Amino acid sequence: LTHYDYWQDKLKPGILIESRADMLIYGMGEKPLRSLVAELKKGTPFSEIKSIPQTAYLSTPKDMAQMALEDDIHLFSHEECLQDKLKQAKNFRHIEEESNKMEASRILQIVGDEVIVVNPPFPPMTEAELDASFDYPYTRLPHPKYKGKTISAFDMIQYSVNIHRGCFGGCAFCTISAHQGKFIASRSKQSILKEVKAITE
């Protein structure tokens, strides 16, 4: 969706427009990625995969008219936002409001002759799902591309342990609620202690 780019100091169209990706998965991607892989394994053509929660894709106004849902939220178009910053602010308000709902609506935004479609998110993970997600053999190391470079933030988080996902906040300086959702999903005590033990060994 239309967003402010700090480096270029201007509003940019949705990432789908510039990347030309077939689909984007937003937020924490375990559930949507599994759903996408399951559809592809069944042989569903990629062009027909439109309803997976927590995904976004490009469509056309004609196609969206045929697939309209009663509670769809139609944002001001990208072009309208370029002309009026208050319209962009109103769009952002809708996005924030939907991120605070357990049952959010689908969000649509016209950009030129295309429509960005953002499906609502999955419900928060259960404790068991979150435990399973943290049970993979993560290395706890920086990405290999840094090749021995000093990463000051890594020193701070090297031994940190996530005990939950999500944040009900929405602080201007932080994007955790945008990435992880506004609802808290907690790990079990056993899962947390298992990770702490692994770090200390």
What is each model feature region?
Residues 1, 16, 178-201:
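Core AdoMet radical
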Residues 3, 24, 158, 162, ...:
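Alpha-helix capping and helix-loop boundary segments enriched in small/acidic/polar residues
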Residues 1, 32-34, 126, 140-141, ...:
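Flexible loop/turn segments at secondary-structure boundaries
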Residues 1-112, 116-123:
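Glycine-rich beta-alpha loop elements in corrinoid/cobalamin-binding modules
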Residues 150-172:
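N-terminal pre-triad scaffold of radical SAM enzymes
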Residues 129-156:
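Short, charged low-complexity linear segments at domain edges
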Residues 22, 133, 167, 171, ...:
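Conserved, mostly hydrophobic/aromatic
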Residues 175:
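Cys/His-coordinated zinc-binding microdomains
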